[in-house]
Amino acid sequence: MKHRVVGRRLDRTTEHRTAMFKNMVTSLFRHERIVTTTPKAKELKRFADKVITQAKRGTPHARRLAHRDVRDVEVLNKLFDTLAERFKARPGGYTRIVRVGRRAGDNAEMSVIELVDRAPAAAPEAEEKGEKKATKAPKAEKAPKAEKAPKAEKKPAKKAAKAE
């Protein structure tokens, strides 16, 4: 019976699983969007929401607790300075899971897990692409094709053998 059993093992030892989630939550806070398998994304959502809730407290003790899970100081500062302010008014549900299909190699169901109020990073990329298209030179006309050389006549192999 599975009463009061919470979480997934994901076919890993406890140490491997906790290390994996610490690395994944650090990547999630750094990039604000990562692609992973759906079961990992569902577990990471629980893990990340707890860390963001700690960051919203903003106390030195909360920073120490979050530092256990987010070992990169740069990402930890981003979490407490930027992300905590962004999610201040939100009572929970800081992440979103979007299924994106199946992985080609092993047919595993893949998902994108992202922070709900992501920074608008897509707009500058679109502007850059537009600028590149605008500055692109028009294509030059194609040169006319050269005339083909006449092919040499070949005798079939059987006739050539009989002729000798």
Curated annotation (Swiss-Prot):
Coiled-coil stretches: none
Pfam families: Ribosomal_L17
Keywords: Ribonucleoprotein, Ribosomal protein
Any one of the GO CC terms: cytosolic large ribosomal subunit
Disulphide bonds in the chain: none
Gene3D superfamilies noted in UniProt: Ribosomal protein L17
Residue stretches of biased makeup (Basic and acidic residues): 126-164
InterPro entries attached to this UniProt entry: Ribosomal_bL17, Ribosomal_bL17_CS, Ribosomal_bL17_sf
Protein name: Large ribosomal subunit protein bL17
Subunit structure: Part of the 50S ribosomal subunit. Contacts protein L32.
MF-aspect GO terms: structural constituent of ribosome
Annotated family: Belongs to the bacterial ribosomal protein bL17 family.
Species per Swiss-Prot/TrEMBL record: Anaeromyxobacter dehalogenans (strain 2CP-1 / ATCC BAA-258)
Tree of life domain: Bacteria
GO process terms (BP): translation
Disordered: region residues: 118-164
